[in-house]
């Protein structure tokens, strides 16, 4: 009879071979051995659920491919709501065999997971484009148009020319077939990847602004209107990266 340690090692080695694992412990009555099997079953079920969820996240990409499109980009932005800093968009073209289990709406991910997916997407994606629109331009053309402009710039930064765009609740002035999806970052793998890249890119920019303007602590709130942020504006006035057209900033500095 194998020791529990040996069983654990064999389960890890043959984790995909269900019949082997059941045969391994079918006559083993030890609680410790049975617990290992229970753990394996739970992990296997979790992996199956993650694979099913990933397949579901590819439905829009697969539908586009079924219509004959071959280069599909998912686009999303980060930073529409903050009082300071740019709005950042990312366009991501995934390879056909890319698998990013667990990727979902980037706002629901912990910072640690988001950074891990960011690194994975950078490594696994066929192409990534980033578009940035600064606070002064946001004040000039409004945040909706600035978000659209950031998305257009992101597409223009791609080395590959997409023939189909999946966009989170937006239509872009581009001569490319496009589909806009409400809450797309929770429904489309490509959009979710774009959302993750945009969010991390913007967060990194805000951390740098935090070093440039330490009195505002941008690295903590990323430009959102927290109580501490509003108090800092009240004390120090607006920084060069504040959106002066946004009501909370306007009311504090007027």
Curated annotation (Swiss-Prot):
Enzyme Commission number(s) from the entry: 3.1.26.4
Boundaries of every RNase H type-2 domain copy: 70-254
InterPro entries in alphabetical order: RNase_HII, RNase_HII/HIII, RNase_HII/HIII_dom, RNaseH-like_sf, RNaseH_sf
Keywords associated with the record: Cytoplasm, Endonuclease, Hydrolase, Manganese, Metal-binding, Nuclease
EC supergroup of this enzyme: hydrolase
NCBIfam families, per the entry: PRK00015.1-1, PRK00015.1-3
Compartments where located: Cytoplasm
Protein name listed in UniProt: Ribonuclease HII
Source organism (scientific name): Bacillus pumilus (strain SAFR-032)
Pfam families named in the record: RNase_HII (PF01351)
Xref: CDD domains: RNase_HII_bacteria_HII_like
Co-factor binding comment: Manganese or magnesium. Binds 1 divalent metal ion per monomer in the absence of substrate. May bind a second metal ion after substrate binding.
Protein family per UniProt: Belongs to the RNase HII family.
Required cofactor names: Mn(2+); Mg(2+)
GO CC entries: cytoplasm; ribonuclease H2 complex
Any GO molecular function: RNA binding
Catalytic activity, as annotated: Endonucleolytic cleavage to 5'-phosphomonoester
Task performed by this protein: Endonuclease that specifically degrades the RNA of RNA-DNA hybrids.
Amino-acid positions noted as binding a divalent metal cation in the UniProt annotation, renumbered to this chain: 76-77, 168
Biological processes per GO annotation: DNA replication, removal of RNA primer; mismatch repair
């Amino acid at each position: 009879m194998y020791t529990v340690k040996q069983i654990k090692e064999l389960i890890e080695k043959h984790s995909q071979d269900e019949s082997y694992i059941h045969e391994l412990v079918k006559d083993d009555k030890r609680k410790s051995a049975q617990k290992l099997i229970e753990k394996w079953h739970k992990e296997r079920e979790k992996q199956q659920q993650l694979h099913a969820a990933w397949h579901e996240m590819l439905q829009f990409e697969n539908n586009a491919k079924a219509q004959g499109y071959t280069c599909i980009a998912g686009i999303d932005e980060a930073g529409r709501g903050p009082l300071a800093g740019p709005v950042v968009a990312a366009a991501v073209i995934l390879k056909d065999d890319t698998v990013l289990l667990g990727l979902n709406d980037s706002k629901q991910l912990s910072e640690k997971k988001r950074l891990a997916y960011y690194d994975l997407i950078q490594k696994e994606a066929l192409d990534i484009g980033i578009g940035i629109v600064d606070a002064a331009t946001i004040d000039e053309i409004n945040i909706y148009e600035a978000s659209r402009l950031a998305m257009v710039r992101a597409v223009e930064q791609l080395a590959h020319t997409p023939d189909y765009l999946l966009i989170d609740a937006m239509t872009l002035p581009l001569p490319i077939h496009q589909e806009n999806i409400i809450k797309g970052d929770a429904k489309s793998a490509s959009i979710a990847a774009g959302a993750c890249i945009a969010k991390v890119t913007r967060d990194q920019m805000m951390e740098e602004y935090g070093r440039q303007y330490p009195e505002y602590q941008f690295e903590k709130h990323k430009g959102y209107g927290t109580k501490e942020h509003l108090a800092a504006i009240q004390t120090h006035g607006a920084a060069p990266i504040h959106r002066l057209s946004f009501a909370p900033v306007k009311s504090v500095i007027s």
